A protein has these predicted regions:
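Catalytic core of pol beta-like nucleotidyltransferases
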Residues: 1-21, 29-35, 48-140
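Short hydrophobic/aromatic beta-strand micro-patches
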Residues: 42-46
Length: 140
């Protein structure tokens, strides 16, 4: 982890000392960033703290991160984003910090299980859409 990312992790931990994990995702995680790229970070918090914290995109923490990085920073509360987004972050992101390996592994396992279940549930819907090219009033 480079010095810039280490500093950003420290800012997140200053505001959320109980953070269980922090992931870098998006263009920076893929090594495809350019001059106008934002930095995408996801923080895994204990369940009760995640609920209390809510959406972090416009939080004081996100603003402090953006000020430090001198670019936009998208900070997401990993427990509160969609199942599809959780799966994307887990599978394409880079783990920058982990203080609770069992909690991280449990979250990743549950998120993957939820994603698999969602994929199974929507498989028939997707097949019907591909067959008819209609999103509504499609009989199976």
């Amino acid at each position: 982890m480079n010095a810039e990312m280490r500093t950003l992790v420290e800012i997140v931990l200053r505001d959320f000392p109980s953070a269980q994990a922090i992931y870098l995702f998006g263009s920076y995680a893929r090594g495809e960033q350019h001059t106008r790229s934002d930095i995408d970070l996801a923080v895994l918090l204990p369940v009760d703290i995640a609920r209390a914290a809510g959406d972090l995109r416009l939080s004081d923490t996100a603003l402090a991160l953006a000020k430090q990085a001198r670019r936009d920073v998208d900070l997401v509360n990993l427990r509160l984003v969609s199942t599809v987004f959780q799966n994307e972050i887990i599978h394409t992101g880079v783990l920058l910090y982990c203080s609770d390996e069992p909690a991280r592994q449990e979250f990743e396992m549950l998120a993957l299980s939820a994603y698999i279940k969602l994929s199974e549930e929507r498989a028939d819907i997707l097949r019907a859409f591909l067959r008819t090219r209609q999103a509504y009033n499609v009989s199976q």
